[in-house]
Amino acid sequence: MTAEIDPPAYTLVFNPATNSTPNTVAEFQKALEKGSDETKIEAMKEILVTMLEGNPLPEMLMHIIRFVMPSKNKKLKKLLYFYWEIVPKLDQDGKLRHEMILVCNAIQHDLQHPNEFIRGNTLRFLTKLREPELLEQMVPSTLACLEYRHAYVRKYAILAVLSIYKVSEHLLPDAKEIINTFLLAETDPICKRNAFLGLSELDRDNALQYLQDNIDDIESLDPLLQAAFVQFIRKDAIQTPALKSQYCDLLLELLASATADEVVFETALALTILSGNQTVLIKAVSKMIDLAVKVSDNNVKIIVLDRIQDINERNPGCLEELTLDILRVLNAEDIDVRSKALTIAMDLVTSRNIEDVVQLLKKELQTTVINNEKEKSSDYRSLLIKTIRGIAVRFEEIAANIVSLLLDFITDLNSVAANGVIAFVKDVVELYPQLRSNILENLIAKLESVNSAKAYRGALWILGEYSTTESEIQDSWKHIRQSIGEIPILQTELKNQRKSQDEDDEATEESATKQAGPVILPDGTYATENAFGSSNNDNKKKLVENENRPPLRRFVLGGDFYTASILASTIVKLVLRFEKVSERAAVLNALKAEGLLMLVSIIRVGESSIVEKNIDEDSQERITTAIAILMDESNPDESSAERELLNIAFLDATKASFKGQFVAQKKTKLFKSSPVRKHKEAIDQSVSFRLLQENDNTAVSGDAIDEDLQLAIRGDAARDTSSIAISKLKKIVPLTGFSDPVYAEACITTNQFDVVLDVLLVNQTKETLKNFHVQFATLGDLKIVENPPATNVVPHGFHRVSVTVKVSSADTGVIFGNIIYDGGHGQDARYVILNDVHVDLMDYIKPAKTDDESFRTMWNAFEWENKISVKSKLPSLHAYLDELIKGTNMGVLTPVESLGEKDCRFLCCNLYARSSFGEDALANLCIELDPNTEQVVGYVRIRSKGQGLALSLGDRVALIAKQNNKVIVGHV
């Protein structure tokens, strides 16, 4: 019986001469026949690259045997063995080529070469051979190398023995005994490690016996052998659960004494796989944290943290006491490492350690403010604020302290971070009503130093919605009045400008009265004078004046009248609420009068020339509406009804909307983070009893590390193991018609980075098709690895070929080709054109999630945009959104509660997806119902870093329309 062997691994080789014209076979032959060793080396490199690109170069085999194989040059010999790896060793009938007999003799001589490096390189080459006819002649020489004096030879010899046995057991029927004997007698650690790996794969009982014999000395063994022991224990414990407890004790001892980083990581990982005991998990994860702190490679840090996150998800609640230890990783400079550590710590925070965590994060936040000039300091600060926000919302006891902490830093934060702080304050005042009074007091005290208009608008909304008592309303009003500054704004600013102009004129007159001519310094030299000094001084003066202005006045004079419109709404809310909670009519009238004065002053200054940008129509309309509400003196019979409508619009509706949105978001977060949801099982899932089940591998949980390895190799295809036959039937594409002389169909299998075409060819004629071959070519970022070789197909015969197409991006790709075979009786070759195969873009696009800040950053950074106008006869806006999500495979970032009701007439949302190649795709949907035609009209804007992905997704939107026959799409 032939042992199962792994498929060969391929190496990606960079071709440095892609733009040059490739050499012909004759040129290669001439270079090998008459060139020097250096010329032969360059020729061999080009030959290897050419063969790896799909051209087998069969004419070169004899020339290489004649002119390269006898050479003594070490570099040439190394390239020669690379050539032996990839050269076709079998003919079309599947038999060994005659030329390979000469190659076998040369390999045997190298196995007996006095140079140990040549022997070792030759033995390593044997591990890559899969032809029993070739290996059969190498067995005696390979066994002789097991006793060679140099360990470099022996370490490859034992691997060659293992490889030969896996290819064909009858070549080395006693391989298990050979490896076991070699292991017992060997002293070199690398050789012992290779031998033990081979023994554990072929003979589990002897490997276990060797492990038991060395248990007492395991702490002093070489790290390579220790790692091999850990690998064996991890796999064997899954197959023999009865030994798990003993294995765990052994691994704990090894974990405590191991010094090599690799052994520590592998041992800790094995413990977390074999045991769910909290004590064991804490010891293992503690070692992993120490490793993440100690190593300098950021990739290693992220790998270790990923493993810790997986452990925490599989064992919720077991790692809580390690929260502060994980935060030690924040000493790293890489933002991705810090983000991963904070994400894990967020899941581990409890009421017992919350205060310590907040204190540590506070120190980190202070450090970012002190080291503000450092690169990525602002990104890290935003990350810390986001983490602190998430913690405070969960724990009421520290929410007030955290609000005060973040408001203390708001002056030093950029616009995005400051807006995040205000959004957090908004959540806290809604979630914890008992803290509102103190939070409003702190907020009002810190608003004077806020420089971000967006953050200030959020603060105004908070003041308008949550100032509910008479004293709170008056405090908020005082701040607004101080923030506006002296009013009327226009007259005050003009007065200040005239005063400043007078001072400048006086200074000019004084300078004019001074003696003209050069200025002589005390040392007798002439002083220099900057011709631009006066203009620079003017700019500095204006900048200082702008900074000294209060916030609202600065925003208004800067042309930010959107903030002014928010101020107008806030003033109306404060007046209406004061009217409800207070009976002091004089104070109410004073508030109305002062509010009118502020709003009218803003409109007047917005229409003047002293602002940087005049007021826009929308903002002016909103401010005018607020003025009309404050001046309302309508019919007393209608005043109660109108007042009720105003109260609903300004005091109840917006707050109720925010509260509903907040509750919905909270429910969504709780549902997503629920441990029950993460570890749920089907209600009808069968219960497995180990003592009653048959001795097969189907009931045993797999090795998590091996599963991760399969995911890395095959991508998401490794997950989809169910209904393989059904899924393959859906992927069959006809390449020719039934009336063609050759019928062809392809089964398309999509992997993470390639597409495999399994093509079935049927000769429908009564003649033998000679020199029959299939040729494929591609359009787009696709590349054919190798076209299938020519063959002969008998009448009504079948032939199968497999073609691998490498995919390097998520752009639309097309595979086309033809079938060529010789015509009969001296006729020309005949062709059959194949149908085009379109690579499905959706196989490489996956829905993803990101925060609003990252989405906006990418939206501004990406330069390629595809804007598509939409007209649809679908019944609702949500129906079109569902079709778009289904067709583009993108995820919606906008919260569900913000999308509106099912019968809404306007819908705007953001969508996001990532490709298997790390490409980001952003989309913005903005649609509405046309009041005349009741059709869905609007735009879809798609942005990406590269042009191809944006165009491909745009084509996908158009394709959805054609398939649906309900949507009419036009490109802009």
From Swiss-Prot:
Major localisation: cytoplasm
Membrane topology: Peripheral membrane protein
Highest taxon of the lineage: Eukaryota
The name this protein goes by in its record: Coatomer subunit beta
Function, as annotated: The coatomer is a cytosolic protein complex that binds to dilysine motifs and reversibly associates with Golgi non-clathrin-coated vesicles, which further mediate biosynthetic protein transport from the ER, via the Golgi up to the trans Golgi network. Coatomer complex is required for budding from Golgi membranes, and is essential for the retrograde Golgi-to-ER transport of dilysine-tagged proteins.
Pfam families in the cross-refs: Adaptin_N, Coatamer_beta_C, Coatomer_b_Cpla
GO CC entries: COPI vesicle coat; Golgi membrane
Molecular function (Gene Ontology), one example: structural molecule activity
Keywords tagged on the record: Cytoplasm, Cytoplasmic vesicle, ER-Golgi transport, Golgi apparatus, Membrane, Protein transport, Repeat, Transport
InterPro entries: ARM-like, ARM-type_fold, Clathrin/coatomer_adapt-like_N, Coatomer_bsu_C, COPB1, COPB1_appendage_platform_dom
One GO-annotated biological process of the protein: intracellular protein transport
PANTHER family: COATOMER SUBUNIT BETA (PTHR10635:SF0)
Residue span of region Disordered: 494-522
HEAT repeats mapped onto the chain: 79-113, 133-170, 317-354, 397-434, 481-518
Organism: Candida glabrata (strain ATCC 2001 / BCRC 20586 / JCM 3761 / NBRC 0622 / NRRL Y-65 / CBS 138)
Compartments (UniProt record): Cytoplasm; Golgi apparatus membrane; Cytoplasmic vesicle, COPI-coated vesicle membrane
Quaternary structure (record): Oligomeric complex that consists of at least the alpha, beta, beta', gamma, delta, epsilon and zeta subunits.
